[in-house]
Amino acid sequence: MTNSTGSTAPATVYKLVVIAGHAPEPSFTLTGSPVTIGRELYNTVPLNDPHISHEHARITQSHGCFLIEDLNSVNGTQVNGVSISGPYPLQPGDIISLGNFSFRLDEEIIAL
């Protein structure tokens, strides 16, 4: 987006940054919606952990807000140490825990 001075406005990128567990990537950029987290390779965030369900959780974006929902997983999903049920709003800095993994939702401003 270009502002009145002709310069380009910065873009905001959101990432799930791995803070516990051994994921195939150190972070996952939240592009598109929905983002699925689970044990199967077809998930946006595939995690090799027997404590994570095949389709464990889903993150969607609506009107600039991210929501995470546990998909009836066996071991549940936590945000900031609290078990969630139903869609739960996420904010930058929130810690998402499932199985042996924890992620932090980071917001990154990129100058264009």
Outline where the language-model segments fall.
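Intrinsically disordered, low-complexity acidic Ser/Thr-rich regulatory segments
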Residues: 1-48, 60, 110-112
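A short, compositionally biased micro-patch
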Residues: 21, 30, 40, 50-52, ...
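Residue-level detector of beta-strand structural context in well-folded domains
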Residues: 26, 33-35, 43, 57, ...
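Residue-level signature for short turns and capping positions that connect secondary-structure elements
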Residues: 35, 42, 52, 64, ...
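C-terminal boundary/linker segments immediately following FHA domains
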Residues: 46, 67, 78-112
